Design a protein with these regions (language model features):
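Cell-envelope and extracellular/periplasmic
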Residues: 1-285
Length: 285
């Protein structure tokens, strides 16, 4: 209602609102969230004991008043905000997190699938849908920090799409705000999550639910040809120059590439005068 929606997750609200509009049935959403939290805090004790014994659980023996940032500590948000809602039957989960784990993407790559498996085990409803959001563009650079951290987390989130069964990922590269870690366009994020649910959970055929995702590339003399999943209907740049692609030769130095759509706009060909014999490609990395 207007009286209580202001304190609710905007992304979750727009997700449920779009589902209700399309399905024409009430859609209930439980919001369990804490801004700026680390994934470690959303994982239960058993996962750490069995799979990650190297991660300390000493926080569990501390006096609560001595814990300055519970959202950073292993198990605490799981204990307080996930375990109590296990009694509810759910259709699926949406997840928007990752910004606070920039410092160690490879650990995130292990923890994220482990968390999803543990939640599914807790609910005992099989591999229920798990749709998540790739972190948005923002100048995450911190003092003495590696400027590639955000790109590495996004890459890990993309790779987790293959590690987590019955999962979907929403890309936000086009709707972020480089100067604000909380981009205002939550409606697009919620709708994109809803499209995954409509297509894969509610089996609404014909629903386009994902933007193009990198599949593979091949080398053709001076060109690199990039193929994508979810591009069967063709891609578009809306008559604007395609920017962000770079290619490199054997020296490993990347240069901006000219990108052209072809093959019914399902593939991209890349060239650069500075790279006559390309061997590698990257996009916005």
């Amino acid at each position: 209602t207007p009286a209580n929606v202001a304190d609710f997750s905007a992304t979750a609200y727009f997700f449920a609102s779009y589902l209700r509009k399309v399905l024409n049935v009430p859609v209930g959403v439980i919001c369990s969230s804490w801004g700026g939290s680390k994934i470690e805090s959303w994982i239960n004790k058993e996962v750490y004991t069995e799979k990650f014994p190297e991660i300390s659980l000493s926080v569990l023996t501390k006096d609560p008043k001595d814990i300055a940032r519970p959202k950073d500590e292993p198990t605490l948000l799981y204990n307080a905000m996930i375990h109590p809602i296990k009694q509810f039957t759910i259709k699926g989960t949406i997840w928007y997190q990752g910004e606070s784990n920039l410092n160690n993407p490879q650990v995130y790559k292990r923890l994220f699938p482990a968390m999803v498996r543990s939640w599914r085990k807790e609910w005992n409803q099989g591999e229920f849908p798990f749709y998540y959001v790739q972190i948005a563009p923002y100048d995450y650079g911190r003092k003495n920090a590696d400027k590639t951290e955000a790109a590495e987390i996004r890459q890990v989130q993309l790779e987790c799409l293959k590690e987590i069964p019955n999962a979907g990922m929403v890309v936000t590269a086009d709707i972020g705000n480089r100067t604000c870690v909380h981009p205002s366009d939550k409606e697009s994020v919620g709708k994109r999550l809803a499209l995954w649910a409509l297509a894969k959970t509610y089996q609404r055929s014909g629903t386009p639910y994902s933007g193009p995702l990198y599949k593979s590339f091949t080398i053709d003399k001076e060109k690199i040809i990039v193929e994508f999943d979810y591009a069967e209907m063709g891609m578009t740049s809306y008559d604007r120059e395609i920017v962000g692609f770079e290619i490199a030769g054997k020296d490993g130095i990347y240069y901006p590439a000219k990108a052209v759509l072809f093959d019914n706009k399902t593939k991209v060909t890349l060239t650069s005068d500075q790279v006559p014999e390309p061997v590698g490609v990257c996009l916005l990395y």
